[in-house]
Amino acid sequence: MTVRMIALCGAAALAFSANPAWAGESTDDAASAAAAEADTGAGEETIVVTGYTGTKTDTALMELPQPVKVITADQYQAQGAISISDTVKYAAGVLANPYGRDTRVDGFNVRGLDALQFRDGMRDIFSYYASITSDPYNFSRVEIVRGPASVLFGQGSIGGLVNLVSKTPDFTTRGEINLVYGSDDRKEVLGDVNLALAGNLAVRFVGRARDADTYVDHVPDDRVMFAPSIRWQATPDTDIVLTGLYQEDDTGSTSQFLPIIGTFRPNTVAGEQLDRYTFVGKAGWDRYAGRSLQGGGAITHRFSDAVKLSLKARYIDSDLEYNTHYADSYTNPQDPFSVYGTDGRTIALTADASDARMNVFSTDNNLQFNFATGAGIEHKLLVGIDYSWNKVAKRYAGGDEIVDLYDIDYDALATYDPTGPFIKESQKQLGIYVQDQIRFRDRVSVVLGARRDRVTGSSGQKDNATTFRAGIIGEIGAGFSPFFSYTESFLPVAGRIDNGDGSFGDPYRPQTGTQYEAGVKWQPTPNTLVTATAFKIKERNRVLYLAAGGTTQSGELNTKGFEIEASHTLPGHFELLANYGYSKLRSETNTSLDYMPRHIASLWSTRTFGLVDEAQLRLGAGVVYSGKSVSTSDIWSIVTPSRTTVDALAEISWNNWRLAINATNLLNNKYFASCLARGDCFVGAPRNVMGTLGYRF
């Protein structure tokens, strides 16, 4: 990236351009909150956490009949997160990086199902390999809604969604600068400056510049990110926030799609194994490089204590160049090298080149009414309308050649340049929703909601759906609050059935799902919360990719599971998070779909100690466990073993300075994240160590 060193210097200059005093953690607009508010009590601090994403209203988590997880930036940075996928690995029922670290996309499964990613309550990814990944430093927190959420968010995934909440200005002047050096020659400068220009006007600048390699040769991980925002409180009742983002990535693919034979299983003919981090492409040509430009705004106006208007909109313009190679381990997964020779080394290598452009416009607008209908009966009535339009255009080129995968002549590999017309697909979605949160005598909460969606695709395909949600939670004493909920989901699928012979059939049917869930939340003290829940999900019309080529759609799939999540926090002193999740998918006709680990567990804890001269030492450690996974096809089954990784943190802070050492996969466990019966394997990321020198002002 030609601008990398200029950007490093520029980010440093930006961060040092302000000179006020540091005022602690970032505090974003309470109107978009799911934040922790600390009030000093009798001898300890009390944490009241509200969840916005679960209901689009500020509601205490103990009043939500659905599990919602809020992960603050301080938490996931302490855990050593370097991607959005990493931020969610200590959440119950969430599998982060199911195919290992992937520099191209963020991957996470919620309740065994792929989860959609939202930004500030609006979906921001509509196609694989058409945009670059989001930067975790640009967000104040990550929210996870487990279970369907279509009533509020429209087209959504069945298992749940991950919502990223952007950093926005407040009216306290402060800032920070961080210098990072780490594994794979990672060099970074990060800056976050918040300036209060007046009592009702503030700006914020968040930036990152990174020059880094990865554990795979010839795959860089370079980034420039700059996110300005401005907040104007026009009146005491009117709040306006404008946000922007420019991000440029120059990376490749850490997922090399290596054959099972020669990695996970022995290659008895060749008599040797491939290195687990083998690069199979052409240096300088294989790349995943793109740019994302975003602009958005939010207006909140309170007409009175009883009526509030919220308006949001965002536009995304992104482009991407994606060139890659991968071996043909799919024609004969059990012996891929025998297809092209007898030496156990020769295989076909496919080169794919693509250019992609993506444009997205989203808006979400609602009115909230607070009123009472009797003694001790309070309502939060939400009525809203949202609209989104997205267009994705791609063009392709590529070819195949025969290579010795153990000794590739990289210079001889052919390259391709997409020059043909772009293949375009677009989609429009309009939704109307209504939700009523009813609170009875400050002990029982009922949530009722309904939504109507209309989706139109560029092929003329039209889908309509009505989805519902209902839930109840009530406090029965001793901090126990049992809950029950029913939710539905609706996800239109663009395109048509691929017949596998170059022709296409009927349009895809929308994916739909329903979920029943029952559980209990226990809050014995204000700083402790335990949630246990059991669920059953029924899913229809998942798109399936056939081994012989082409696609089809599933019939009915059923997923059952159980989760338990516990947290105990004393701000500034101690933190403990413990999670366990179990899920199992059943299909009457296709056993190959149950390939995700059934068991996921994690434990994370930090403790802060006082040192001399007001210095503090914070130590942290965590363990993440993923159970074995089984991938099945008509010819064989592949069992990927369970794995356990350890993370650690050591941090010293003194006055405005901070020195931190983060390590993920501390013991350097060399594991496979997933091996698929179709023929390829994905390795887990090795140990990553980062040192951070930070200054807050």
Where are these regions (language model features)?
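Gram-negative outer-membrane beta-barrel transporters
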Residues: 26-27, 442-443, 536, 553-633, ...
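Acidic/polar loop-and-plug regions of large Gram-negative outer-membrane beta-barrel proteins
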Residues: 210-214, 227-233, 237-300, 320-358, ...
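Outer-membrane beta-barrel translocator/receptor signature
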Residues: 137-140, 151-228, 234-238, 293
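Structural signature of Gram-negative outer-membrane beta-barrels, strongest in the C-terminal barrel
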Residues: 231-235, 358, 377-382, 386-388, ...
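Surface-exposed extracellular loop regions of Gram-negative outer-membrane beta-barrel proteins
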Residues: 250-263, 391, 473-517, 529-552, ...
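Face-selective signature of the C-terminal outer-membrane beta-barrel domain
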Residues: 295-317, 347-460
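Acidic, small-polar-rich N-terminal luminal/periplasmic segments of exported/outer-membrane proteins
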Residues: 37-172, 518
